[in-house]
Amino acid sequence: MAGPAERTGASPAPAELGAYVALTALGLGLRLYDLGSRALHHDESLHALFAWYLYQGRGYAHDPMMHGPFQFHALALIYFLFGDSDATARLLAALCGTAAIGACYWLRPWLGRIGALTAALLLTFSPIMLYFSRFARNDIIIAFWNLLIVLGLWDYVARRRPAALILAAGAIGLGFATKEVTFITVAIFGVFFGLRLLRELFEAAGPDPAAALRTLTSPAKAPLYLAPLVVVGGLSLPQFSAGVELPAAWLGFGPLAPNPAYPPPWAGLAAGGLAGALVAGSLGAGLLGIRPGLALGLAVLPFGAVFPLAPAPPDHFQGLLLNLALYGGAPPSAWG
């Protein structure tokens, strides 16, 4: 993928930059004008009320019916700063909708100057986007997080900047804290980057398919290919814990198990033995000067996947074993 400099050329002209500033300012005005005159929708009333409870010091308890906690904490902060009213209940949505307009400026490397400016224009005047930017629900907030995910991951693919991955990781985390629809977002990006990874590996390998595997397992090159997948998959992996509740119950532990005794006596011994074996193997590999390879990665992967997904064991050994497995899985020769 061509880098941003190759696609956009020189810095934007003052008129182009001014157009984004004007559209963003106009979008803000359209979203703030008469913001509190319309009666609150049922969903808006729930978000406004429970955020007000938090603002009043009555605490917050997560309820999946109203999705993630981000909106309630952000609205409570807005109440603290600007007071509580129907207008301030919608202020978060208005700000996110406005920020999405300005963010189109950074889409120029991929949409082109005309395309990015057109996107900003459409976001400014779109009746649907304008409506949800004046609606105290998570729709426009999620749309803004998704736009930041696109900007972060696409910029990383183009320029390999760690800051771009941090942006994407933050947006994914905030997306999960806002609404469960982020599962779908992660699935879309995961499929895309998985297919892109395969294409790049086979292009780099040429007529030798084994070269693709060597690239994927190379300590020097693997991070460049796998970092977006690690961000997308790693942040979302613990969110899929419900998918292992039934298998855990079949094994005799977890909240769905018929026996309330949890965990079973053998769970700690089994997990500790596996973690110890992985750490011992990785230390031995480091002493022998062996770089981490496919075999070691495959050995660590199941343990690293099961522990974030499994119903949480008691804290006194959960963190210890998880850290031993994940950080001990790479031999010392790979740390420096």
Name every feature range the model reports, one short phrase each.
Residues 1-296, 303-336:
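Membrane-integral, polyisoprenol-dependent glycosyltransferases
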